[in-house]
């Protein structure tokens, strides 16, 4: 474990926030959406079609992912375009995949 992490004692609020973040990863549909966003920005309809899900289901999951700050959105005309919030998201998923492969 890195020394920096060992020296820091997380507050109760930080532990709660971390638990809430990990809850978001507890749904395979959300993982699929994040994984799809690895390759770029997409609108809700594009994501729904590529994942064989309804637009409503994808919108609901994107709302949760946005609240968790894992995705960001921007308006393009009448549509919202979604992308990963930052590189941390792909790093977390990649490390999770490495962990389960061990």
Name the predicted role of every residue range.
Residues 63-101:
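Charged, amphipathic alpha-helical coiled-coil/dimerization segments
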Residues 1-17, 88-102:
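Amphipathic alpha-helical dimerization/coiled-coil segments
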Residues 13-56, 69, 76, 80-87:
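N-terminal helix-turn-helix DNA-binding core of bacterial DNA-binding proteins
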Residues 4-5, 34-35, 63-64, 82:
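Short amphipathic alpha-helical surface micro-motifs
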